[in-house]
Structures are given as C-alpha cells and as structure tokens.
Amino acid sequence: MSVRLVLAKGREKSLLRRHPWVFSGAVARMEGKASLGETIDIVDHQGKWLARGAYSPASQIRARVWTFDPSESIDIAFFSRRLQQAQKWRDWLAQKDGLDSYRLIAGESDGLPGITIDRFGNFLVLQLLSAGAEYQRAALISALQTLYPECAIYDRSDVAVRKKEGMELTQGLVTGELPPALLPIEEHGMKLLVDIQHGHKTGYYLDQRDSRLATRRYVENKRVLNCFSYTGGFAVSALMGGCSQVVSVDTSQEALDIARQNVELNKLDLSKAEFVRDDVFKLLRTYRDRGEKFDVIVMDPPKFVENKSQLMGACRGYKDINMLAIQLLNEGGILLTFSCSGLMTSDLFQKIIADAAIDAGRDVQFIEQFRQAADHPVIATYPEGLYLKGFACRVM
C-alpha cells in the first residue's frame, strides 16, 4: 500500500481546482512513512484519492502534485511525456521567433513542479528546486538524455530555496561537454554571450526577451539609462533601436565586462555605450543632484521580496527607486519598469508606480504592460506562475 497524505476536512478544495500545492496547514496526518521527496498519494479526510505528489516534510509546501490522474505513475515515461508536451510549444515559438534558446520547462506550469530547464543552443541547464524534483533526478535526466541526445546537461541547482526543503546546493556537469565560459546565443537579431556556469540563475534572463525587443520602439535618438543592466541585453537592444547613448549600471564588473563584449559582438557603436559599476540607488541620487536627464530609463531590479513578511519593505524599495527614475526623465520620457517578485501583484506594482509619480511631482501615463515571455507560460490553475510584470510609463 502506498504512503498517503490525508487532508483535513474541507481542505481539498484547491486540489479539486487542480492547484499543485498542498500546504502544511491542510494536512491532517500521514499514513505510512515517506522519505524526503518520495512520491505519495494525497487523499481527502474520507480517503478519496485526489492526486499523486512529492512529499517535503521540511517545507511549508508539504506536497507538490505530479499528477491528478490515478493511473499515471511517476517514472521515466512520465517525464518523457511532460517534456514532449512542453517541447511542442517551444518548437513553435523557436521557429516563429528564430530562437536557439528558450525555457523548456517552467515548473508547475509545465506539470513538473520544482523543475526549471533552460535550453541554450545544445546545452540544457537544469534547476531542481524542490525535494520531489531532486528525488526524481535520475528519471528526469534519463528522459532528457533520450529525448535530447545532442545536448549536454549542466546542473545549476545552486539556489538558496533548496535549503528550505532540507537539501544541499548542487552545481556541475551532468552529461556531455562542459559549456564554454561564454556561450553565444541569438535573440531577436542580437547575439548575446551567456555564462552558464557562473551567471545569474541559469546564466541569462530569458523571461525578459519580449521586453527587450519592445524597448526598441522607444529609444531612437534617445538617451537611455539601463539600471541593473547585468550583461547588457537591454543595452544591446537599445543600440539596435538607434539610441544616441545608453548608460548601463550594475554592481558586478564581470557582468559589465560581458555587456561590453555583447556590444562589440553585435558590431554596434561602442562610443554610444557607457558602463558604470555602482549601486543603482546611490547613482540615481547622484544623477538627480547634479541635474542629469534621460529620455528612457529601464528599471529591471532583482527580486526585492522573498516572503510575505518582506512585502512592505519591498514596496518602499520599489517606490523609492521608481520615484528617482521619474525625477530623472525629461518631459515625455519613458520609464520601462519591472518587478520579478512573485508576491508583488500587477495591481500593487501599478499603484506603487502611481505613488512614486506623486512623490516625484510628476504625472505618468501607463502606455504598455509587460509579462514574462511566452516560453514561460502560466497554467490557469497556478496563477503564482505569473511572477514577472512590467509597465511602460510616459512621464508628463
């Protein structure tokens, strides 16, 4: 008999709506013993089968659902089916947009909770973020090797969230050849260098692909400030859009060096690109105090909030940084501002920008809204999958 997680009475509603998480407060008891990440059956208080998922005793998310089909086993064939289903959508996108790199698996939204896989050319970069994903590592890798024999697999599960599930951080080559120090990829006519081994996340922010392209419509003959620039994707796109100057700001000299290489790789005018190593908050105040002005500002900060207790402080941070940006914009200037914090809703983020404009003494018009690129889908039963939101704002 399989190990069963029994829900408290009335706590089955989210599963009946096919939400993939079971929180610790919904659990009445365990019937049998399960190891970290092991597959268990989830039943209601009367013993009715609801789902099959991965057990995580150390996490507030006590179980993550693999399947709502009682006949489906969690094995190599299961992962092969999920991967093939996800690949169909990415094949269409890759052909339509001319992509050689994309998110192959977007966790829960692709039916594989706790699993992120990005493809960069012939390299698959893997992040296993939950106990269940780690428990199924061998089955997943076997499925990947069968479906993608041409690809090397590199593990970037060096993510702090694993500690919440009682797991160590892991990183390194799984199969195939080691990725080069900087791997060139293509995106909307740009060539970009990706550091798979040491870069942020899996090496590059594929989720901002469409936003980088959209930037081009606003920048012709404009002076652009690119905040939290990382390796310069927005900067290269701005130069391709015909900007007169782009100033990229980041605290990482390594990232700025790659940004410079990306400008050179695309044979763009390096004299129009400036790279500044500094704290963005500090530099924006310096620019304000000396009367600097820009026509377009890209504000793409890292995640400010990891849990609900940090949300209030994050709101203040987003408000302050957007207020400073609005103060630096010329009349009619464009602010492209983003939040990748899942707990920050689009409505709340829009309110924060409106409040920032009031504090800056300026009016703003919301003229365009952004979200993560289409290779980062959001399944309807898991709205938490929509984490990236952004706005184009015209400053009056």
UniProtKB/Swiss-Prot annotation:
Q: Where in the cell is it found?
A: Cytoplasm
Query: Which Enzyme Commission numbers does its entry carry?
Result: 2.1.1.191
Which ranges carry the PUA domain?
2-81
What enzyme class is recorded for this protein? Answer: transferase
Q: Does the keyword Amino-acid biosynthesis apply?
A: no
Q: Which InterPro entries match?
A: PUA, PUA-like_sf, PUA_sf, RLMI, RlmI-like_PUA, SAM-dep_methyl-trfase, SAM-dependent_MTases_sf
SUPFAM superfamilies per the record?
PUA domain-like, S-adenosyl-L-methionine-dependent methyltransferases
Which keywords, in A-to-Z order, does the entry hold?
Cytoplasm, Methyltransferase, RNA-binding, rRNA processing, S-adenosyl-L-methionine, Transferase
Q: Which GO terms describe its cellular component?
A: cytoplasm
Q: Where does this chain mainly localize?
A: cytoplasm
Q: Name one GO molecular function term.
A: RNA binding
Catalysed reaction, written as an equation: cytidine(1962) in 23S rRNA + S-adenosyl-L-methionine = 5-methylcytidine(1962) in 23S rRNA + S-adenosyl-L-homocysteine + H(+)
Judging by the UniProt lineage, the source's domain of life is Bacteria
Protein's job: Specifically methylates the cytosine at position 1962 (m5C1962) of 23S rRNA.
Tell me the protein family, please: Belongs to the methyltransferase superfamily. RlmI family.
Q: What is this protein called?
A: Ribosomal RNA large subunit methyltransferase I
Organism of derivation: Escherichia coli O139:H28 (strain E24377A / ETEC)
Q: What is the taxonomic lineage of the source species?
A: Bacteria, Pseudomonadati, Pseudomonadota, Gammaproteobacteria, Enterobacterales
Instruction: Name the encoding gene, please.
Output: rlmI
